[in-house]
Amino acid sequence: MGYKEEGKWWVSPADYLPEVTKDYNFPEHIEILDTTLRDGEQEPGIIFTKEDKVAIAKRLDAAGVHRIEAGCPMTSEEDAAAIKEICSLGLKAKIYCFVRGVLSDMDVAKACGVDGVIIEVPGSEQMLQGGMRWGMEKAIKAASEATKYAHELGLMVTFFPSDASRSDMDFLSTLLNGVLDAGGHFDSVALVDTFGAFSPEGAAYMVKELLRRVGKPVEAHFHEDFGLSVPTTIAALKAGAFCAHVTVNGIGERAGSCPLEPLVMSLQCLYGQDTGIKYDELLGLSKEVAARSGKPVPPTKAIVGSRLFGWETGLPTGYWQKSRDINPLIMMPYHFSMTGQPAPHIYIGKKSGAANVALVNERLGLAPIEDKDKVKALLHKVKELSIQVKRDLTDEEYIKLYHEV
């Protein structure tokens, strides 16, 4: 596997140079935990019904997601019922739910039939004291009792110290080791960047420190407040974290969560890390979540946008016209079919040239225009109308102008 895979991707050869990759410490297998049904739904205005959650869980499983965080059963009776039904489906994915550091929450989770729990306790001094009015001793007591009880119930346990990214490293490691020393148990710890405050370098540092000081597998839960959730998650994985938390389309509070689609495609194409996700399922999954969340996908959104493959400007359209039968990857970093996208669409508008006319005519079944003067006349009309309406033209608008010349 390298920077160029026939029919799949063609990225920079620099991405795979030994001097670039020499310090990578990716795990042997990267796990993807999707939290669309919990953290994604926390975006104001997004409400998933039981039917929505079950349908999305099925699509996540079909896409190969390894773990599904199906929600928080204490939120409502419907959420608990949705989690129970998802657990009854026999999906390949492991099903987790989100709980507080309260013993009764573990009983509710167990009754839902989940494989594991994600137990939240504040992980920074400011959140403990300012948000909970707790001291370190109380936090350790609550977390150790909750994690121990969850383990005794046969549940896998991910400890989720919120706001960990803004914690002092000594404070965080004291909390985590204190939980273990007090008899608590967790199978992994999430490095939680609740407010999207990590740089990639900061995340990598804290992953390494957690592995060194606590010795438990690390998961990466990052947000998009500075637009860096994907590179920061990759930095955490490169530093030894084994699991990435994501949402479909990046939905979530404030600027959202780490989006599934560009993360897994970047890992595959730019870093040679196959997560096992079925990339050709990404577009359908994205559309399903967009429809059920009521939040449309921007047309230029990475990987799943509707206008990623195609051109209006004349120069790249000309390049495509000449190269499409040689190798489509000359004009794109990964093949459109890899993610379930349709073939490139040629638009026509203010910035278009003769190649656009030729390819749009071909697509619409219109006769080629051999007379160059007629092509120029048609383009003049196209540009005038495009400027007037401030967009590229519809097929109907173009056909009308075509027949005029």
Regions found by a protein language model. Name each.
Residues 46, 72-73, 95, 99, ...:
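Hydrophobic alpha-helical scaffolding
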Residues 3-6, 43-67, 85-89, 103-216, ...:
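Alpha/beta enzyme core
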Residues 38, 73-75, 98-102, 122-124, ...:
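Active-site beta-loop-alpha junctions enriched in small/polar residues
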Residues 94, 118, 243-246:
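Short hydrophobic alpha-helical runs that function as membrane-insertion/retention elements
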Residues 195-325:
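Catalytic alpha/beta core domains of metabolic enzymes, predominantly
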Residues 48-51, 55, 77-81, 104, ...:
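Conserved active-site and cofactor/substrate-binding residues in soluble primary-metabolism enzymes
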Residues 2-36, 272-405:
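A mid-to-C-terminal "edge-of-domain" accessory segment
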Residues 1-103, 345-348, 352, 358, ...:
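N-terminal capping/small domains of soluble enzymes
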